[in-house]
Amino acid sequence: MDESALTLGTIDVSYLPNSSEYSIGRCKHATEEWGECGSRPTVFRSATLKWKESLMSRKRPFVGRCCYSCTPQSWDKFFNPSIPSLGLRNVIYINETHTRHRGWLARRLSYVLFIQERDVHKGMFATNVTENVLNSSRVQEAIAEVAGELNPDGSAQQQSKAVNKVKKKARKILQEMVATVSPAMIRLTGWVLLKLFNSFFWNIQIHKGQLEMVKAATETNLPLIFLPVHRSHIDYLLLTFILFCHNIKAPYIASGNNLNIPIFSTLIHKLGGFFIRRRLDETPDGRKDILYRALLHGHIVELLRQQQFLEIFLEGTRSRSGKISCARAGLLSVVVDTLSTNTIPDILIIPGGISYDRIIEGHYNGEQLGKPKKNESLWSIARGVIRMLRKNYGCVKTDFAQPFSLKEYLESQSQKPVSAPLSLEQALLPAILPSRPSGAADEGTDMSINESRNATDESRRRLIAHLAEHILFTASKSCAIMSTHIVACLLLYRHRQGIGLFTLVEDFFVMKEEVLARDFDLGFSGNSEDVVMHAIQFLGNCITITHTSKNDEFFITPSTTIPSVFELNFYSNGVLHVFIMEAIIACSLYAVLKKRGPGGPASPSLVSQEQLVHKAASLCYLLSNEGTISLPCQTFYQICHETVGRFIQYGILIVAEQDDQEDISPGLAEQQWDKKLPEPLSWRSDEEDEDSDFGEEQRDCYLKVSQSKEHQQFITFLQRLLGPLLEAYSSAAVFIHNFGGPVPEPEFLQKLHKYLITRTERRVAVYAESATYCLVKNAVKTFKDIGVFKETKQKRVSGLELSNTFLPQCNRQKLLEYILSLVVL
């Protein structure tokens, strides 16, 4: 294989928009030329042939622009039309041209000279943090409160002793928390990482235009918050290394205290890392630790006050599924509070995407099979480094989204009408149990709790949750799609029974173009044959390659063992967010058609657009714990409506002729459709209803499904993408038919996971990857949100029992039927 196509020691022209060199290079390769490929059957080609540009004029999208609706001023800030054309740079490709020196010695010492010339010094970083935090008013109040609890009725002398005792405890906590950045250690680590990264990565690509935006943001003298996705332990070092190489101040990195281990913790502290508890409520009695919360809040405020940069992983932990997890916005709330108190004028938010051909951990099969997570230790880190040095992990693509003003975002949200979003229970129960009286609620559910909550606190919580969703959605849009993601996805959901190498290369090429057409970037370049072989090299443990003497071709088959399928699914999930909305429409289309069936209208191939959008929106709610599906400033109904419009544009759905629509009289179920769902679920606005010149029956239109082979294959592919998720949810619904309750939640998760694994081992499951532990946890969380389970707290363990609504067996059966209506097996 031609390594030059992938190592990218210099800028690869295939990354540059409208590159004539790129066009010529592609024309030389007959199998890559669009004109020749157009006559061959592939999974997506016909679905997008109407609107696809030719390969020669295809532009790489510039990803990561901020939300124009919520931050219109930031949209034009730090960005100019020349930014996207700046191209990519391989960060770990360093030679004498990157230094001020030339000659033989400069070539031999280029790494040392490059590191020495980086701008990093002590004055860049925070000083006197511990004392400033201890003397802050909030921490002083917390110390006095905790001391009062320790000595409620003591004398003044005893009270003074209690205060001193609490102060010592606070100082000890801060010693573990506060980082003491060492410029010398940053330089040394930069040199070591440059050597290490060159040994086990082929390249680390960044977009030079994105770095220009970050540099422009640093010149505002405002604190920056970097919020990247979390894929691997290497993430902690990767961002600091990239910023260091471009003379940008290293951020203070929030890290879980599971990494607070001897020697390694000292290194992390010297590089700007600070350790925080994974759970803030770690007092023996499970109460809020007032002192720790005050110290953490004071520490963040002090860093921001001194205009330091922060790096926070909103997901809280590495993604074990390959998908971006839901946000945990604890530290983000501290940042918002700091700005709300006018301590600093503004904060700039920078979401980030990180994509790997192969993560250094390789996979998370142990945890996905239900094995307990191993605690990190110095020995495990040493073994990991040794293992890394013996392998190659391919390419890395890091993206920095456009910085946006947190102050502007908060002000724009305050000007929007505040309305509480629908809970999953409010959104889905009317569809699952249509005969249930509206407004019915169980005793002991969250209804009474919500009513008693302070409205201001609830509004603040929603504001922070929406901000976190905004950031994660932008970060996911910024994540490049790697070659391993596409190959794993094709093998699992297009060619699960195996495929010839030549056909796999064709489908890879077309799927790559589909990714670009949806405004997602790629983390690779080169001709498709080389890139596919590159991906197969990293997925080798999960696939079987055989040589067929008949056609003299290699045949690629995904392995059927559970660990192999889990690993392929991990990498395949890297491309799921590209097609998630289209997959939701495809599954909803199946559900609507199946429901109408033989007893429906005269033309069962016609689908009500209104009905399809409602069904898709309810599926969005059902899958909302699988990650951020849309921006919070958009409703599910808006994006479902837009996606249906794209299906019409693709030609997959065809608007029926007026004569065909007039022949159809809506059935009773269709007439009552809106009555089964809460009023806010309409994707049309009140203004549209008032201004429309047409009746309700004329605003809805009917759609026909294209019967072409290519379109049907595309729909099937999309339905398979959600197959593992829906099979896991439906299997969980089957499992609760015999729920004995009450039961501790960890025990229930373990039993449900064992049930799913057993289904897979007995080959009952259609998708073996439906048995991953992540899907088990997400299914149970969704059932809690819907109101299937009531959650009880005993000491520090959560317990589960069926709610009053789902105690009747018939209602659990309706839940199962609702999920099964969406499942395509």
Swiss-Prot record:
Per UniProt, the keywords (alphabetical) are: Acetylation, Acyltransferase, Lipid biosynthesis, Lipid metabolism, Membrane, Mitochondrion, Mitochondrion outer membrane, Phospholipid biosynthesis, Phospholipid metabolism, Phosphoprotein, Transferase
Q: Where is this motif: HXXXXD motif?
A: 230-235
- The chain residues annotated with the modification Phosphoserine are 380, 685, 692
Annotated GO biological processes are:
CDP-diacylglycerol biosynthetic process; diacylglycerol biosynthetic process; glycerophospholipid metabolic process; phosphatidic acid biosynthetic process; phosphatidylglycerol biosynthetic process; triglyceride biosynthetic process
Q: Which tissue types show expression of this protein?
A: Highly expressed in adipose tissues and lung. Low expression in liver.
Task: Note down the stretches annotated as region Important for mitochondrial localization.
Answer: 80-120
Say which enzyme class the record assigns: transferase
List the transmembrane segments. Answer: none
Pathway(s) of this molecule: Phospholipid metabolism; CDP-diacylglycerol biosynthesis; CDP-diacylglycerol from sn-glycerol 3-phosphate: step 1/3
| Keyword set includes Translocase | no
Question: Mind telling me which CDD domains this protein's record contains?
Answer: LPLAT_DHAPAT-like
Tell me what reaction this enzyme catalyses.
sn-glycerol 3-phosphate + an acyl-CoA = a 1-acyl-sn-glycero-3-phosphate + CoA; (9Z,12Z)-octadecadienoyl-CoA + sn-glycerol 3-phosphate = 1-(9Z,12Z)-octadecadienoyl-sn-glycero-3-phosphate + CoA; sn-glycerol 3-phosphate + (9Z)-octadecenoyl-CoA = 1-(9Z-octadecenoyl)-sn-glycero-3-phosphate + CoA; sn-glycerol 3-phosphate + octadecanoyl-CoA = 1-octadecanoyl-sn-glycero-3-phosphate + CoA
Task: Name the intramembrane ranges.
Answer: 88-118
Q: Where in the cell is it found?
A: Mitochondrion outer membrane
Chain positions recorded as CoA binding sites:
278-279, 288, 293, 328, 461
What is recorded about the protein's domains?
The HXXXXD motif is essential for acyltransferase activity and contributes to the binding of the cysteamine moiety of the acyl-CoA and the phosphate moiety of the glycerol-3-phosphate.
Give the protein's recorded name: Glycerol-3-phosphate acyltransferase 1, mitochondrial
Organism, as annotated: Bos taurus
Lineage, broadest ranks: Eukaryota, Metazoa, Chordata, Craniata, Vertebrata
